[in-house]
Amino acid sequence: MSSFVNLESLISERGANCRGADEIVNNETTRILTSQIEHSQRSKKVNIRNKLSVAECDAFRARYGGAFDVNLTHEYTAPHSLAGALRVAEHYDCIDSFPPEDKIIDFGGSWLHHYSRGDSRVHSCCPILGPRDATRHEERMCRLRKMVQTSDRFVDVPDFCLNKAEDCNVQADWAICIHGGYDMGFQGLCKAMHAPLERGILQGTIMFDGAMLFDRQGELPLLQCRWQRVGTGSKEQIKFDFINESTLSYVHDWKNLGSFLTESTYSIGGTTYLLERMLLKCSIMTYKIIATNVRCPPESLRHCIWFENISQYLAVQIPIGYNLNDWKTVRVARATVREVEEISFRCFKENKDWTENMRSVASILSAKSSTVIINGQSIMSGERLDVLEYHLVAFSLTLNLYQKYEKLRNFQGELEWKGWANHFKTRLWWCGRTVSTEGGFLRNFLADKIPWLKLNTYADSLDFITKISEVESFEVDSVPTSRLRSFFQKEENIVERAASEIMSANARRIAKKAEMSKEFDDFVDAPEEFAPEDVVEEVINTPVTQDVKLRQSKPETARSIVLDPDAVLKNGAINEFADYSKRLHENTVSNLRHLWTLMGCRGNEIHNKSVAETYHRVDDMVNVHFPNGHWMYPLKYEYTVGYNDGGLGEKFENELYVVDKTCSCANAKAIADACKKVSAPTCSVVMVDGVAGCGKTTAIKETFRFEKDIIVTANRKSAEDVRKAIFGDASDSEVALKVVRTADSAIMHGLPECHRLLVDEAGLLHYGQLLAVADLCKCSEVLAFGDTEQISFKSRDATFRMKYCNIEYDKRDIVSKTFRCPQDVVSAVKILKRKCANRSSKYNGWVSSSKVEKSLSKSRIVSINQVSMEKHKFYLTMTEADKAALCSRAKDVGLDKTWVESNMETVHEAQGKAVDHVVLVRLKSTKCDLFKSEEYCLVALTRHKRTFEYLYNGDLGGDLISFYVT
């Protein structure tokens, strides 16, 4: 049945005045009127899809809530969300200030924004000033195509060009500039308005902070943006960095942005342009530039600029880096300076050394610019100074007091007649002033004719430079211009391309609608002789076409785009693990560099041993090796690398270097480099997911085939346990070391090819780590043994986000019978899983063959001295701090180092262990989330065969172990 209605036939048959036709006309008229009303109101409605905080929502509504119908949908998280939301509203605000039917030019704006709103009166000048602008055009093209394919509204070509604003020939009376003034400046905007066709009024917005005129850096708190001025003169720039954002920052010439703060008028020919700063809200300034050709008489303009209480501050000059040739301005509260001067002047003693007077000034300055605690309440006295500038401000204020004191004394002295010589000096040399930065006639004449004469004070020629430190900043602020050629060549190309994109997208949309319409048109009642089996048989017997065969064949080129989701997932996991390993190496280098600097290590000497002593008390693995071969502290650990000015790496006996716990096995960089060379394997992954004590190590031993298999473990201790289980006394043999390896060793040094890869405690491995090993050994199957509910892979960098750390398996075999755990542990774990709402856990149905009925107990202790050390027991802790305390306790009672290392571990380290007697020790009642962790508590409760004793000091909220152990 056709989907189209023949109106002419309907009218001829039924009549134009029939009720149905009348309703159709009325409905269509209503729809058109509704559409027109919605279009007229579109400029009054602002849809903001960014997620905003409560404070940001309030600020946005306070700024634009009255002028527009603000709709905050909170759909997605966007970088610098408030700034982006404000920018959308700024477009509406600026455009709404002009006549609704007049042409408007947008200097540097987004043509897609106006096109999506259907506002055809706005022409956008979008020059490509760098890679960012070029890539923005690419992104807009993608979004343009998406809009055209999903809506019938977009049929016209966007109205924009790639010309700079001053080169654009589009005629319009009005212009807008939304955050484009950073690259053009006030005078640049005036030139763009003037040539080639004059535009009457421009309205724009720009980020604004009055402190930019005085400070070198500052913050726009509501926008979460920091700004910093760098460089000097014509090369000075201002940088904007959004706090806690990963997006690109912004760098602009200071002279362009500064012009909006310092300039007010500019004339070109007979046209005068006036800058009017209209409104400052949310650290965004809305301004207007108005052009006039009217002959204007001279006038002194005074502009009220919002410097947010800037008049309450004084500029104090302080030296930079103890260099008397370089000074900077520091803002100090006017009240603080005046009170310091008032009190200090009363304490000023001429017979004192200047340092004594400076101490008095510093003491008073501290009292007037610090936090005072009275009756337990903090009261701010004055305004706090930067701790790095406090002493220099005190120094400058002291010199200022000396200067004022000397001025008064000289003034008093000049009141007395001291002869013609003194009269000559004060009148002709100093122009009647005893102290002046400007000389008199004679002094200026000599300085001009004989410039090499030293007519100023000794400070002008004093060269006193103290170089304290060098700080290098790695910055990438520019890209070679040649890179831009890969984006667009000519303006005609991009305009033609936009038209082509619209035609292509519209054609595809129309074709899709026609195809859907055809499907409905062809849908008719099937004849009686029609049978569904005929269609099935026809499809089955239809030969495969050549096109289909080509699509099924493998690509001939080596560089092919990976479209298989499984391959994409595996490549992502490997790359993530490589990046994670690289991050660990960078963290190690950064920490050691910081330690090296704090210790004051230079050359062959360490200048600040107290820092080393402090760090060593916290971590006894921190040590310093001297060039004479001795260590600062007795050597108790083995280190493979060290750090000094030569970087992190192997060191010689005659070098000075520092070490910490990461230097015992620093292999992260080697692992990262090796992972970059592997690719995603095609082998299958079978997960043997067994409960604690189900005999995973025994299963590995029975499954292992020497000729075909290789075993990989998560850590060195697991590898030693597996070697002992399989090879017995020959666990240190070359063969055992070759076929049973740790994952890190396999990645760094490689391993033989095999048919099957067996993995012990697979849950402790990163998925990318397991895949890298599988690719290196070219196996066809990975048999991973582990427990998906015990402790999994944990990142050692809290800031590194993991996406692929959990192992993805093709098949999972569940083992729910334990041979190790006593019966009361089985019951306790079942309750634990139910309390944690883990209804799908395999532990809900696990059973035990153990004959031990009662094993769990707990006791309260008040100190570590109540922990008895018994050689037949295994001691567990949740934290490294508790473990270190237990190790010290064991050494105090005379237990040897070998026993301590083999019988005291953290719960994380003990995963996979099986012992008869376990003692879990908690020495503090401070917050520890590990005792609330389901996986950590599961591991702790399932290590023993016979007894489990929980020794705890104080009550801890949410302690799952204490809850289930009675």
Swiss-Prot record:
Chain spans, region Methyltransferase: 49-381
GO molecular function, one term: RNA binding
Record has Flavoprotein as a keyword: no
Sequence segments annotated as region (ATP-dependent helicase): 687-951
InterPro entries named among the record's database cross-references: (+)RNA_virus_helicase_core_dom, Alphavirus-like_MT_dom, CMV_1a_C, P-loop_NTPase
Domain of life of the organism encoding this protein: Viruses
Key words, A-Z: ATP-binding, Helicase, Host endoplasmic reticulum, Host membrane, Hydrolase, Membrane, Methyltransferase, Nucleotide-binding, Transferase
UniProt keyword Transferase, yes or no: yes
Record-annotated (+)RNA virus helicase ATP-binding domain positions: 660-815
Membrane topology, record value: Peripheral membrane protein
PROSITE patterns for the chain: ALPHAVIRUS_MT (PS51743), PSRV_HELICASE (PS51657)
Binding residues annotated for ATP, in chain numbering: G690, V691, A692, G693, C694, G695, K696, T697
Function description: Involved in the virus replication. Contains a helicase domain and a methyltransferase domain. The methyltransferase domain is probably involved in viral RNA capping.
Protein name: Replication protein 1a
Organism: Broad bean mottle virus
